[in-house]
């Protein structure tokens, strides 16, 4: 049964990975054709800054998955429930730390971005920050699927979300070439 689940997880993860790459490429092409190139640079900078802040997780996910294996194998639902409550608190704390650290970085954004003509750049960053930080408030649940060898369920949900987001972003860029709308969609989907 474990081999069957593992192969199913690999198959769905591979499909999801290639789908994500293709969708990101299409969205990036539409992005470059619809908005000034400066927005692409800002988008990349914010992505890198927030990836650095996401290091706050520091390997919590593998520890969660490892601690769930035994109670799931023995069907100890009380232990699973209590561990999930603990992980929920940990992930909410991590999300709050990321948001707080990100807010503390706002005064130094001008140091990273010189001579820009883009108005509202700090608001753009704040929306990116919320998108990253708030994702931790519910992402702890994924670890239960991984520990239960049902990663394919997560892959399906992520793929559907990626498709919806990509289609909405492409439509938004083509109809209303607005960076505001582009990043707000990231927060909503």
Task: List each language-model region with its residue ranges.
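Small-residue-rich midsections of specific transmembrane alpha-helices
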Residues: 23, 27, 44-72, 91-94, ...
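N-terminal membrane topogenesis motif
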Residues: 1-24, 78-85, 121
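Helix-terminus/linker motif at the lipid-water interface of multi-pass membrane proteins
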Residues: 25-40, 110-114, 173-175
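Transmembrane helical elements of multi-pass membrane transporters/channels
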Residues: 8-28, 40, 161, 185-189
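Hydrophobic transmembrane helix module of multi-pass membrane transport proteins
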Residues: 2, 47, 90-189
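Interfacial/gating helices of multi-pass transporter permease domains
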Residues: 31-55, 179-184
């Amino acid at each position: 049964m474990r081999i069957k689940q593992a192969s199913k997880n690999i198959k769905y993860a591979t499909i999801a990975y290639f789908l994500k790459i293709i969708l990101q490429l299409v969205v990036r092409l539409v992005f470059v054709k619809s908005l000034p190139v400066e927005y692409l640079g800002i988008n990349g900078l914010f992505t890198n800054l927030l990836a650095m802040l996401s290091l706050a997780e520091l390997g919590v996910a593998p520890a969660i998955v490892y601690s769930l294996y035994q109670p799931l194998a023995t069907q100890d639902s009380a232990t699973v429930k209590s561990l999930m409550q603990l992980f929920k608190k940990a992930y909410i704390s991590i999300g709050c730390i990321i948001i707080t650290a990100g807010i503390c970085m706002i005064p130094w954004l001008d140091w990273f971005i010189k001579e820009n003509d883009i108005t509202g750049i700090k608001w753009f960053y704040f929306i990116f920050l919320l998108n990253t930080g708030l994702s931790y408030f519910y992402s702890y649940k994924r670890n239960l699927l991984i520990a239960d060898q049902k990663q394919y369920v997560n892959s399906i949900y992520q793929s559907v979300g990626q498709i919806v987001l990509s289609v909405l972003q492409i439509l938004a860029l083509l109809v209303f070439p607005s960076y505001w709308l582009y990043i707000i969609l990231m927060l909503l989907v």
